[in-house]
């Protein structure tokens, strides 16, 4: 929710809130994946219905919603879902969340799409969530933007790994534990990277006077 007193184009801070729904969804997904691997068609359908919105959010954050030079986020998301379902019979639970396995496929497909488009880096996202959620903490804050262009510019100043962690935590909604498993890091390192990224964005906004 944007404060009435905030003028268009400005960015404001809101306190981070914990949202356990994504973690619960990840736990349910881990359980139903085992049933899908065993050949349960209803479980397979549930897996697809669960992962599709997650994949779409990730691809739109990494690719953008508008097709450029044949690059479409929704097309990439469809490829990710197809590749994931195709790989399910060979999937083995090795103690990592299934969302980490899904992220690996999604990151690979996004990289393929950028190579095909002749780009070395991700396009900025056209859409970002109105509310960001992460672990509560007095120094950790989320940023809402009326100007999507401004937010894209802010995200681009971050190192690639910090930007990726923010996308997984904020846009996709993974827990710190799930994000750590996805990027091959530790929960503590993810929280530190997230805090540093948010602090850098905050400092940039304050320095630019882009707040109310």
Swiss-Prot record:
GO biological process, one term: regulation of DNA-templated transcription
Induction statement: Positively autoregulates, probably directly, expressed at a relatively high level throughout exponential growth and during stationary phase. Expression decreases during O(2) depletion (hypoxia) and after heat shock (5-fold, 45 degrees Celsius).
Disruption phenotype: Not essential for growth in culture. Upon disruption about 260 genes show significantly decreased expression while about 200 showed increased expression. BALB/c mice infected with the disruption mutant showed a moderate but significant decrease in virulence, surviving about 30% longer than wild-type.
Superkingdom assignment: Bacteria
Any single Pfam family the record assigns to this protein: Sigma70_r4_2
CDD domains in the record: Sigma70_r4
GO function terms (MF aspect): DNA binding; sigma factor activity
Residue numbers spanned by region Sigma-70 factor domain-2: 49-119
Keyword annotations from UniProtKB, A to Z: DNA-binding, Sigma factor, Transcription, Transcription regulation, Virulence
Keyword 4Fe-4S in record: no
Segments of the chain annotated as binding DNA: 176-195
NCBIfam families: PRK09648.1, sigma70-ECF
Function of the molecule: Sigma factors are initiation factors that promote the attachment of RNA polymerase to specific initiation sites and are then released. Extracytoplasmic function (ECF) sigma factors are held in an inactive form by an anti-sigma factor until released by regulated intramembrane proteolysis.
Domain writeup: The sigma-70 factor domain-2 mediates sequence-specific interaction with the -10 element in promoter DNA, and plays an important role in melting the double-stranded DNA and the formation of the transcription bubble. The sigma-70 factor domain-2 mediates interaction with the RNA polymerase subunits RpoB and RpoC.
Note: Extracytoplasmic function sigma factors (ECF) are held in an inactive form by an anti-sigma factor until released by regulated intramembrane proteolysis (RIP). RIP occurs when an extracytoplasmic signal triggers a concerted proteolytic cascade to transmit information and elicit cellular responses. The membrane-spanning anti-sigma factor is first cut extracytoplasmically (site-1 protease, S1P), then within the membrane itself (site-2 protease, S2P), while cytoplasmic proteases finish degrading the regulatory protein, liberating SigD.
Family the entry assigns: Belongs to the sigma-70 factor family. ECF subfamily.
Protein name: ECF RNA polymerase sigma factor SigD
Species in which this protein is naturally found: Mycobacterium tuberculosis (strain ATCC 25618 / H37Rv)
UniProt gene name: sigD
């Amino acid at each position: 929710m944007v404060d009435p007193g905030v003028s268009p184009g400005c960015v404001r801070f809101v306190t981070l809130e914990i949202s356990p729904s994504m973690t619960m969804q990840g736990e349910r997904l881990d359980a139903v994946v085992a049933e899908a691997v065993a050949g349960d068609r209803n479980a397979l359908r549930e897996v697809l219905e669960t992962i599709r919105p997650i994949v779409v959010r990730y691809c739109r954050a990494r690719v953008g919603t508008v097709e450029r030079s044949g690059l479409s986020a929704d097309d990439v998301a469809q490829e990710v879902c197809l590749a994931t379902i195709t790989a399910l019979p060979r999937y083995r639970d090795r103690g990592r969340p299934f969302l980490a396995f899904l992220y690996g496929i999604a990151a690979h497909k996004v990289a393929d799409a950028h190579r095909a488009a002749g780009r070395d880096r991700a396009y900025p996202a056209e859409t970002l969530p109105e509310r960001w959620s992460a672990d509560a903490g007095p120094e950790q804050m989320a940023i809402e933007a009326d100007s999507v262009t401004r937010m894209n510019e802010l995200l681009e100043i971050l190192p690639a790994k910090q930007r990726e962690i923010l996308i997984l935590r904020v846009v996709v909604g993974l827990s710190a534990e799930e994000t750590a498993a996805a990027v091959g890091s530790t929960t503590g390192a993810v929280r530190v990277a997230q805090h540093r990224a948010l602090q850098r964005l905050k400092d940039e906004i304050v320095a630019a006077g882009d707040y109310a």
